Amino acid sequence: MTVVPVKLNELKNKLVIIDQTLLPNEEKFLELDNPEEIWEAIKKLRVRGAPAIGIAAAFGLYVSTLKSKAANVAQFKKEFEEVRDYFATSRPTAVNLFWALKRMTRRFEQEEDKTVDKIKQALLDESEKIFAEDQEMSKAIGKHGLSLLKPGMGLLTHCNAGGLASSGYGTALAPIYLGHEKGYNFKVYADETRPLLQGARLTTYELYKAGIDVTLICDDMASLVMKEGKIDAVLVGCDRVAANGDTANKIGTSGLAVLAKEYGIPMYILGPTSTIDLDASTGEDIKIELRDEEEVVNGFGRRTALKGVKAYNPAFDVTDAKYITAIITEKGIVMQPYKESLKKLFE
Ligand code: MRU
């Protein structure tokens, strides 16, 4: 993945993102430094995918408050908290957003006895750390994930959990990139991922450009390709993993997991430990984002149902832990019983 989808500009005073709503047809980079633009970019999925949302929020919080003219730390803190709380309203499901905002807050509090300028410097340092750690995490996830795969395998993925959803290497696609470097010749099937087509627009874009064998399928073809024996493993990312292993990911993931179980295909969830939320005991505690009905009936400029027809548009679903073969993090591979194995990751 050559494009870094979320980063700071050279002067380190603007957030730079590739506008993912325009892909694959146009590669347009946006430079943002005000909270409203950054909030809008997250909300509208110009930057999306759990790890990338966290990085955008951290860099966004830094660049938004960098311009502050606050005369003292108390005033600066008030401004910082206002932007932080505003960003927290952008998208509810991916816990990485809240995780990154919490990390930035903790760092602020550690430096609170310093000058405003020193605190700004510390916020830059923390956001750059979040970015750098994400790159390392992706590579480690790739390594652990690859240990479960064999050359020539057929792999099914859903939505986009690749470089575009992170700092440039991805989660579910990380083992695929690593395997590609080692000549594994995977055959990747990418679900289109209705309604916003992250699979069609983003996953095939990045895998095709990387020279990886990728075939696009409509979401409703997953069962068929499994039955035809084309799929040896399902690899998906995650937006929030509860303490018992229940996992929120892009709408449609839970259906794939049920199918995979029926056909005896392993279902792997890949994500950094920042996506694990031990405060959520089960999937019931995960807030699922409901998005505009227009995305379903009028997604890409053409109305597909009569005006007035109701549409339901939850952006995520929760896969019950019982359908998940393993959760692959940068710290290693965990299996059932997830309540114990996930907890151990944080000890
Ligand atoms: O609505 P999106 O595009 O932000 O949803 C993204 C997903 O569901 C991804 O699968 C998930 O964030 C994992 S990204 C490594």
Swiss-Prot record:
What domain of life does the native source organism fall in? Answer: Bacteria
Q: In which residues is substrate bound?
A: R48, G49, A50, R91, Q198, N249, K250
**Residues the record marks as active site:** D239
Q: What class of enzyme is it?
A: isomerase
The record places the site described as Transition state stabilizer at C159
- Give the GO terms filed under biological process for this record: L-methionine salvage from methylthioadenosine; pentose catabolic process
Might you give the EC number(s) for this enzyme? 5.3.1.-
List the pathway annotation.
Carbohydrate degradation
* Pfam family membership, one: IF-2B
State the UniProt keywords alphabetically.
Carbohydrate metabolism, Isomerase
Gene Ontology MF annotations: S-methyl-5-thioribose-1-phosphate isomerase activity
| Reactions that this protein is recorded to catalyse | 5-deoxy-alpha-D-ribose 1-phosphate = 5-deoxy-D-ribulose 1-phosphate
Which Gene3D superfamilies does the record match to this protein? Answer: translation initiation factor eif-2b, domain 1 (1.20.120.420), Translation initiation factor eif-2b, domain 2 (3.40.50.10470)
Q: Which family does it belong to?
A: Belongs to the EIF-2B alpha/beta/delta subunits family. DrdI subfamily.
Summarizing the function annotation, the protein's role is:
Catalyzes the isomerization of 5-deoxy-alpha-D-ribose 1-phosphate to 5-deoxy-D-ribulose 1-phosphate, as part of a 5-deoxyribose salvage pathway that recycles this toxic radical SAM enzyme by-product to mainstream metabolites.
**Which protein are we looking at?**
5-deoxyribose 1-phosphate isomerase
* Designated gene of the protein: drdI
